């Protein structure tokens, strides 16, 4: 016999094997585009930027969040023929802020160099002889 249990915001439904064998009669409910908690993607239906989109990777809420929002908004709403060409000051401001926090915003060059150094260290032979061993082998 199937039954349902509510735990906080979650509804847990226990079903039997027979329940699984019969076709579902559940009706799907259309998503509410005005639901503020519903993931809408980067651009909301009204054309605004969804600063809570996980696709931004938290950039809008970090220590340089305001600079990021300024630069990204400028680019998004840019009407220039070369989109974003009117946003250089905002992007420079964002870059200057990010350079103050290299641990949070590593530059691609820094990441590539660190990876190359790591690979070089792993590839180097780590065999060293002590001076005692060298003397014994030469006698």
Swiss-Prot record:
Residues in CHCH domain copies: 61-105
What disulfide bonds does the UniProt entry report for this chain? 53-55, 64-97, 74-87
As annotated in the record, motif Cx9C motif 1 runs over: 64-74
The record describes its quaternary structure and partners as: Monomer. Can form homooligomers.
**PROSITE patterns, per this entry?**
CHCH
Q: Which InterPro entries match?
A: CHCH, CHCHD4
Chain ranges for the short sequence motif Cx9C motif 2 as given in the UniProt record: 87-97
Alphabetic keyword roster = Disulfide bond, Mitochondrion, Oxidoreductase, Protein transport, Redox-active center, Translocation, Transport
Q: Which organism is it from?
A: Xenopus laevis (African clawed frog)
The taxonomy runs: Eukaryota, Metazoa, Chordata, Craniata, Vertebrata
- Record GO biological process: mitochondrial disulfide relay system; protein import into mitochondrial intermembrane space
Q: What's noted about domains in the record?
A: The CHCH domain contains a conserved twin Cys-X(9)-Cys motif which is required for import and stability of MIA40 in mitochondria.
Compartments reported by the entry = Mitochondrion intermembrane space
Q: What is this protein called?
A: Mitochondrial intermembrane space import and assembly protein 40-A
Q: What does this protein do?
A: Central component of a redox-sensitive mitochondrial intermembrane space import machinery which is required for the biogenesis of respiratory chain complexes. Functions as chaperone and catalyzes the formation of disulfide bonds in substrate proteins, such as COX17 or MICU1. Required for the import and folding of small cysteine-containing proteins (small Tim) in the mitochondrial intermembrane space (IMS). Precursor proteins to be imported into the IMS are translocated in their reduced form into the mitochondria.
Q: Where is the composition biased (Basic and acidic residues)?
A: 115-124
Principal subcellular localization = mitochondrion
Single GO molecular-function term?
Answer: protein-disulfide reductase activity
Q: Which GO terms describe its cellular component?
A: mitochondrial intermembrane space
Residue ranges of the region described as Disordered: 103-139
